[in-house]
UniProtKB/Swiss-Prot annotation:
Gene3D superfamilies: Cytochrome P450. Its main location: endoplasmic reticulum. This is Sterol 14-alpha demethylase CYP51C. Its cofactor is heme. SUPFAM superfamilies: Cytochrome P450. In Fusarium, the biosynthesis pathway of the sterol precursors leading to the prevalent sterol ergosterol differs from yeast. The ringsystem of lanosterol in S.cerevisiae is firstly demethylised in three enzymatic steps leading to the intermediate zymosterol and secondly a methyl group is added to zymosterol by the sterol 24-C-methyltransferase to form fecosterol. In Fusarium, lanosterol is firstly transmethylated by the sterol 24-C-methyltransferase leading to the intermediate eburicol and secondly demethylated in three steps to form fecosterol. Disulfide bonds: none annotated. Together with cyp51A and cyp51B, encodes the sterol 14alpha-demethylase that plays a critical role in the third module of ergosterol biosynthesis pathway, being ergosterol the major sterol component in fungal membranes that participates in a variety of functions. Cyp51C does not seem to encode an active sterol 14-alpha-demethylase, but can impact indirectly on sterol 14alpha-demethylation, and is required for full virulence on host wheat ears, but not on Arabidopsis floral tissue or the fruits of apple and tomato. The keyword Transmembrane applies. Itraconazole binds at G300. Disruption phenotype: Decreases the amounts of 4,4-dimethylergosta-8,14,24(28)-trienol, the product of the Fusarium sterol 14-alpha demethylases. Leads to reduced ability to produce conidia. Results in increased sensitivity to tebuconazole, diniconazole, difenoconazole, flutriafol and prochloraz, but not to triadimefon and propiconazole. Affects ergosterol production in the presence of ebuconazole or triadimefon. Reduces virulence on host wheat ears. Host-induced gene silencing of the 3 genes encoding sterol C14-alpha-demethylase leads to strong resistance of host to Fusarium species. InterPro entries: CYP450_sterol_14alpha_dmase (IPR050529), Cyt_P450 (IPR001128), Cyt_P450_CS (IPR017972), Cyt_P450_E_grp-IV (IPR002403), Cyt_P450_sf (IPR036396).
Length: 517
């Protein structure tokens, strides 16, 4: 070793520095490989074999997470650890894994240490992941109060009108037929329907000007790099921070103006609900909390609905016979000429609901749910212990793509729900729990968990079904859709994006119906 050191000293820096660096890299690689092959830790889940210490399995996971999970499950079982950019990430698949992670005690694991870096610069401080878990659960309770069935009844006509106006006035739908990028179309439709229903007429009217730009700049804050380094001096982060401050002031001004007028009328939007809300301890909800929660509810669900809607319509375009079935179902349920779509008759559109469920099964926008381990956690039935240095990863979508639960799992077939609905229902064992925002099923054994489970289950589930259901029903009533190239396959998922959207070109051909009853 001394002779090597002396040799390196005699070399010029232009040679010794690259050579020394290469030696260090080679030694670290050799050490890493030897440790995995000959000195595995029997008290830890098996580690996915990798060559480069820091990179680990990052590339394979990033290219196709589901393929990576299934391949690792075949080799290592349901529980294994892989290296994600230097971080030991323990995956636990299946019902036991979902229960271990999603129903885990907050003292043992949490979500805020993972997601707080990403969401706090977008939503603001003191809300969501930038407050105590008890306060966050109370905030979810308040948001849920604005998503009742009575509220949804009021929202359905707004959803319908937004889609009708969009198809009538958007430059994407000029003439009687054309080709559109459905990802862009659904992004616009979902933000218009969400803002108009949840945030009221003032906000919706601003979406054609100032608000749309602010929203886009805030949206740019959802970049994967911000999971690790949210404060980087990047142009999009400067725009994100400015947009959040301006949007918060806009919401606060709307709240102040409404307090002055006090004229709610028939409006049932979330602003009216939050401006009069109280925390469980009796403290009135501060206006700046309300403003930041409004940003969170607008941003939090719009991406999922937009991506799911795009996948849904792309799949329908590949199966025109289902488009016709959906149209005929509306005629049968709503009559001809059709009566207005309401919450009650939306529930009667069975196939309309099934295309949503099948899309969420096969194209769940979130493939990985992460939690930071806070205290050592023993994996049930093993001697393995997951240490606090690890991140836990749950992937309910792997069950939804498993042959064990869904025959021909890679096939998009809404009619499968004609037969398997009871299977999903019976997976709930009757156990319930209240994390602070309402009683819910504790079971995580269902193979269909598109909205997650446990204390961080999405409170907007019913709203999402209603919004997407009304959008799809109205869209199909107005236009017929098909794929531009009958031989082209469905676009592949873009797993480099935050929400697994379809890769471009994600296009459909539309044709305006001759008569819209």
């Amino acid at each position: 070793m001394e002779s090597l050191y002396e040799t390196l000293r005699t070399l010029p820096l232009s040679v010794s520095i690259p050579l020394t660096t290469s030696i260090i890299i080679i030694l670290s690689i050799v050490t890493n490989v030897v440790k995995q092959l000959w000195f595995p830790n029997p008290h830890r889940p098996p580690v996915v074999f990798h060559i480069f210490p820091f990179i680990g399995s990052t590339v394979q996971y990033g290219i196709d997470p589901y393929a990576f999970f299934f391949d690792c499950r075949d080799k290592y079982g349901d529980c294994f650890t892989f290296i994600l950019l230097g971080k030991s990430t323990t995956v636990f698949l299946g019902p036991k894994g979902n229960d271990f992670i999603l129903n885990g005690k907050h003292a043992d694991l949490n979500a805020e240490d993972v997601y707080g870096k990403l969401t706090t610069p977008v939503f603001g401080e003191e809300v969501v992941y930038d407050c105590s878990n008890a306060r966050f659960m109370d905030q979810k309770r308040l948001l849920k109060l604005g998503l009742t069935t009575d509220s949804l009844r009021c929202y359905i006509p707004k959803f319908v009108k937004e889609v009708e106006d969009y198809v009538k006035n958007s430059p994407y739908f000029k003439g009687d037929t054309g080709i559109v990028n459905i990802t862009e179309v659904m992004a616009e439709i979902t933000i218009y329907t969400a803002s108009g229903s949840l945030l009221g007429n003032e906000v919706r009217s601003m979406f054609d000007s100032t608000f749309a730009t602010l929203y886009r700049h805030l949206d740019d804050g959802f970049q994967p790099i911000n999971f690790v380094m949210p404060g980087l001096p990047l142009p999009q982060n400067f725009r994100r921070n400015h947009a959040r401050k301006v949007m918060e002031k806009l919401f606060s001004d709307i709240i102040s103006k409404r307090r002055e007028t006090g004229n709610q009328g028939d409006e049932t939007d979330m602003i009216w609900m939050l401006m009069n809300a109280q925390y469980k301890d009796g403290e009135p909800l501060p206006d700046h909390h309300a403003a930041r929660m409004l940003i969170a509810i607008l941003m939090g669900g719009q991406h999922n609905t937009a991506v799911s809607g795009a996948w849904l319509l792309l799949n329908l375009a590949h199966k025109p016979h289902l488009v016709q079935e959906l149209y005929e179902e509306q005629t049968q349920v709503l009559g001809s000429p059709q009566e207005p779509l309401t919450w009650e008759n939306l529930q009667k559109l069975t196939l309309n609901g099934q295309v949503i469920k099948e899309t969420l099964r096969l194209h769940s926008p979130i493939h990985s749910i992460l939690r930071q381990v806070k205290s050592p956690m023993r994996v049930p039935g093993t001697e393995w212990v997951v240490p606090p240095s690890h991140t836990l990863l749950s992937s309910p979508g792997t069950m939804a793509r498993s042959e064990e639960f869904f025959p021909r799992p890679s096939e998009w077939d809404p009619h499968r729900w004609d037969k398997i609905e009871p299977l999903v229902k019976t997976a709930e064992d009757g156990q319930t729990v209240d994390y602070g925002f309402g009683v819910m099923s504790k079971s995580v054994s269902s193979p269909y968990l598109p909205f997650g489970a446990g204390r961080h289950r999405c409170v907007g589930e019913n709203y999402a079904y209603a919004q997407l259901g009304a959008i799809v029903a109205t869209f199909i009533r107005l236009v017929h859709i098909e794929q531009p190239d009958p031989k082209a396959p469905l676009p592949a998922p873009d797993y480099s994006s935050m929400f697994s959207r379809p890769m471009n070109p994600a296009e459909i051909r539309w044709r305006r119906r001759e008569t819209v009853e």
